[in-house]
Amino acid sequence: MKRIYLSLLMSVPLLSIAQNPVIRDQFSADPTARVFNNRVYLYPSHDILPPDGQRQDWFCMEDYHVFSSENLTDWTDHGVIVSQNQVPWVKPDSYSMWAPDCVYRNGKYYFYFPSAPKQGFGFGVGVAIADNPEGPFIPEPEPIKGINGIDPCVLQASDGNAYIFWGAGRCAKLKPNMKELADDTPTEKVKWGMREFEMKGVNCLKDLPNRQAEGPFVFEHNGNYYLTYPYVRENTEVLGYAISKNPMGPYEYKGLIMSEHVNGCWTNHHSIVNYKDQWYLFYHHNDFSPRDDKRRSVCIEKLYFNADGTIQEVKPTMRGVGINKATEKIEIDRYSSASSDVTTELKDTVNTFRSFQANLPSKGSWIKYNDVDFSCLTDGYLIINAKASDNTKIYIREKSAKGKIIAKIDITAKPELPAGMPAMFRRDFSNQWLTLTAPLEYTPKGVSDLVVTVEGNAGASVDWIQFKNRPKYFSPATATEAKPDEQGFIRRWRLMEPMAVDVRSNVIFTNSWLSKKFDEELTKLPRQKGKWYVLDSKNYNMKLFRFAEKYGKQTYGSFFWCETIIDCEEDIDNVRLAAGSNGASKWWLNGEEVLLLEGDRRMVEDDGMSNRLTLKKGRNILRCAVINGPGLSDLCARFVDEKGNPVTNYNVTIK
């Protein structure tokens, strides 16, 4: 009975990832990348932690996922496409689903994979067939006869034939059905220790560096065939390559594509693909399992050819490829370059997929992250996840460690206590991860590079940063007059940048305390030099906290002055001011106090009501002062008539 595989499950979009590794919720190794329908499809093996009864220090793979992306940044997991316990010829508990490949031919997608057979020894190579690159795939009941080995790769050559490579560089032509070796496939006897085997195909790595060679990947470029493969040069694998004019050789060795992993990770395995006129190298490394090199993860780098057709050696990076949108989370710990004192480590050594952190140990330390697209940012602010052992400052700059400042962040690890406050109330945030926000002093244009620098006397660790567009709480007022909205709420306000007040709790907002405080500030108002802004609120209430946040001013422990000008064509008698505020507030109409909202209160419409008032013909000035400690300050105000109906027959101006 034919079995249909698990890609019938719903595809799962992953987080936008423009850093290495690119798959961040599971291990992935031995990546084969192919371009189908103008999209990159990634067919890796799937490392897992060995279950009980399996060898704990060896590779363990039970199934295959397929992933795809249009930009090498946003990856979709299409789910499991083949599993060891559903292939008729595979030993169901072998956990040997090693490096695969997938090609398109004759209107079908052919997925090639190795595994341990139920009968015999070693590895066989099977084929599963689908109508779509993500499946569902249906496996053939038997493996390809004549192949005993691992790591299949299929080349569709310009001569019209398909060739399959496997193991330590063996190669044979496939029949047009893509499921059998060609009838004229040569056979040779091969010695392995004291044993002699008869093997199909030709050995394309003969007379080339091939110690413990495996994982061949072959492609064609400018009339040359490139046989690329991992082999052990000293103690761990490198990626080497050879060139030929014939798919089956002979090949001439040309050098390295990638040297040994610096941390001693034993294996590397790869594929090379051209996508949108750029060549890419897909490979693996044990980033998410640094103490276990049998659990690997896929990484990507750009690859370049020299004029003579040779390949420039690729250096692995943490940054990888792809452009990050500024409004997406940027794992800045996967930086492009850094000062020599910067280190990187896993943020969580138990759940390693929680990613990494970059440690910038002292003043002057920096990390640089290339290719961030700011075109999506209109009215933005910064969010950063960071920690420090002591109070310090970090800056976000453009292009270099001395570049233009985008944002400034204060990390307050050890807040100072107000005078007279007992030490027992001190809150210590030393070495605790804090998610902080900061306004932008400057917004780059288009695609640019980010640099994080330490400007304070203590070092800091950074996990991620993200830019966000502010909701449209308000906009600069126009020169034309406005009216209250249908419910009578005044939306145009003139606001002075907030002043700091030493208020840690709103419980002190008694009537007497507020009256004294507001009256003191009123006498100072003519001498205040704060900047004024005239804004139209998008909502019935003016969000003072967001106003302060946007312009980089005092957000908590704040005192706000707010006013608006009401222009009446005639006297409007017997109206009441109905107002609300988050925090305490005091209201004046034409210089006379009309309402006090005391205590620690939330903003509710019509929370307080004045006595009856008259809006006189001509110009009326409504002024408000709001004070708040730890809350999100805002206010609302309207006038209502004797029946409680909103008054709307006046204009609101800024003149």
What role is predicted for each listed range?
Residues 452, 573-588, 622:
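Aromatic-lined ligand-binding clefts that engage carbohydrates, nucleic acids, or primary amines
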Residues 18-477:
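Carbohydrate-active catalytic/glycan-binding domains of CAZyme proteins
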Residues 407-427, 589-611:
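Solvent-exposed beta-strand/loop surfaces of large extracellular or lumenal domains
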